[in-house]
Amino acid sequence: MSWIVKLGKKGKKIVKKIITPAEKHYVGYTRRIERVKTGERICAMTFDDGPMGLPASPDRFEGKTLTDVLLDTLAQYGAKGSFDVIGDTSENYPDEAGKLGSAAWGGVKFDHYPDIHCDDKGGAVHNDRLIRRMLDEGHQITNHGYRHIIFGKKPFVYGAREYLPGFDAAVADLTRLDTQMRERYGYTLTLARPPHYVDKMAGGFTSYDVYERMGYQYMAASFDGAGWLPSTHEDPEAALQAEIDAMVEPMRKALEKDPDFFCGQIIFQKDGYNMAKRTPVAFALGKQLALLKEYGYRVVSVGELMEESPFTDVGRDDPLFEKLVALAKTRAIVFTDNKLRLDDKMTVGELAMLLAPRDEAISRRVAQLRKTGKAGPYDGAMSYCRENGLIDASTKAEDAVTRLPDAMFDKVTDFTRRNIYAAYKMEE
């Protein structure tokens, strides 16, 4: 039942608050993007787990595939989406269906999209027409994993699930879909979301390491569009209506309380069945888009949203904005929570991430993890900078910056991140 999933999520939050130390964010090449800073009424929508080549459920759209219904609805409102697609789950066997209404409804050991034993109706491999329609109509496609296998253990809800054995397997899985999109469609993927948001992996690696290797940003979300959890109503019509209401009413209340609530936010949706094999998104998406339109919002892809501002705490009104955008394209200057924290003092580890070439910083950290199973987020960059005399060999990553290489910076007396980035001499 859906209450198990809800209980698991609540339990995880409690454990995080009471037992687990607060997550430490660090400067890296990949950051988790949940929302961006903007005063404009612009937001993004993402659609996970498709494309789906089966009809909506219940089918009231003359047999159209669910993905076609979603694309029709987006077109009706002039909206664009980011479709977080999978490749193909037909390799995810042997397996069996779990209990309807549970997290394992579509498979005990693996996920199957759009449903178990219907894998040939789901994913990019089997839905060339839908992928081409997404691209032709200006939507974005992102990488949700070729086989949609979780990156590591997730005991609260998916304790029986198979997971990828480590870093290399995750890179290989993502590369299969990445290669297909490039070779078949000439399309370059730039964003990804890990299956079920599982980040920790075997060997001390995380999804951030994988995405850095792939050249991706981590596409998260700040608002749950809902619909994926089933209603407990026994009557199917009442259940569907409850699920539609669960998608629309929280959005309505948020807008009534604060018309600017969704500025810069990323809204999560599902391109597939919920746990009861219904698709309330087919019926609720239009209502959500109508609400957003009523309040003057433009609904865009995550990529377009990031063109407004790629950062959570710095917008276009900041005098350093353009330089920061340019720097972030080639250097690690943003924390993993997508914040710049410009007014804080910079540490030596953060300086090393600014100075070290991307490939050196990433490859050295990966090599250390392979060798020892442990590596700090700045160890690769620190190693390079020490070898090349860019930082003092005796300094530690957590030490405050007290001096800068003269050839690379204008004069700085107060070593905040803002001042250091402003003083950095950009490469011609």
Segments from the language model and where they lie:
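Active-site beta->alpha N-cap acidic-glycine motif
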Residues: W3, G8-G159, P165-L189, P194, ...
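Short strand-loop junctions, especially beta-strand C-caps/beta-turns
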Residues: D48-G50, I86, P195-Y197, K270-N274, ...
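Solvent-exposed, acidic/flexible segments
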Residues: D59-T67, D120-N127, Y163-L174, K200-G204, ...
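Extracytoplasmic/secreted envelope proteins and their assembly/folding machinery
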Residues: T67-L71, S82-F83, N127-I131, V171-L174, ...
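Sec-exported extracytoplasmic/periplasmic mature domains
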Residues: A75-A79, L135-D136, T175, T179-G186, ...
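Short secondary-structure capping/turn micro-motifs that flank functional sites
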Residues: S90-E91, I150-F151, V198, G227-W228, ...
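Catalytic domains of cell-wall/extracellular-matrix polysaccharide-remodeling enzymes
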Residues: D119, G123-N127, R133, Y146-K293, ...
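N-terminal propeptides
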Residues: S309-E428
